[in-house]
From Swiss-Prot:
Family: Belongs to the actin family.
Keywords carried by this UniProt record: ATP-binding, Cytoplasm, Cytoskeleton, Hydrolase, Muscle protein, Nucleotide-binding
Protein name per UniProt: Actin, muscle
Enzyme Commission (EC) number: 3.6.4.-
Catalytic activity, as annotated: ATP + H2O = ADP + phosphate + H(+)
Record lineage: Eukaryota, Metazoa, Echinodermata, Eleutherozoa, Echinozoa
Molecular function (Gene Ontology), one example: ATP binding
GO cellular component entries: cytoplasm; cytoskeleton
Keyword Zinc: no
Keyword Nucleotide-binding: yes
Amino acid sequence: AEREIVRNIKEKLCYVALDFEQEMATPAASSSLEKSYELPDGQVITIGNERFRCPETLFQPAFIGMESAGIHETTYNSIMKCDIDIRKDLYANTVLSGGTSMYPGIADRMQKEITALAPSSMKIKIIAPPERKYSVWIGGSILASLSTFQQMWISKQEYDESGPSIVHRKCF
C-alpha cells in the first residue's frame, strides 16, 4: 500500500527540473512549488522541492549514494560506443520509453544535458511519445507477433546447457 501511495505521488506531483540548481534556489515555501497531497487516511501532507529532488537522482545518482552515471551520461556513452557512421542518427532519434520517462520536463532536460555532452555540430532530438509508459510492452508485443520470433525462443534446457551466451547466438 505504501508503494502505491509513493507511486501515486510520483505520477501526480513530481517533475524533472530543467536547471536543478536554479530550481533549488526557489524559496522552499514558494506557492508555485508546494503541493498538497491527501493520504488514504485523510491526512494532508505538503510536498515542496521533493517534487523535483527525487527525480534528480536519474541525472545525479550520487544523491542516493550510487556510484553510477546519470541517465544522460549513460545515453551519451552508449551512443559513443556505436559505430561512428550511425551516431548522428542516434543523437537525432533518442526515444524515451517506460513509466519513469513520464516525468514532466524529462525530455527537455535530456535535450539540454546531451547537447552539453555531444559535439556542438550534432543535432540532438529527444522523442517522448505520449504512449511511452507502455512502449516497452508494445515493443515486446510486436516482437512476439513476428513470424521470425519463434526461432529466438530459448528453452530452460538450452539456457542451462549454454548459459547467457545462448541469447546472443539465437537473437543477434
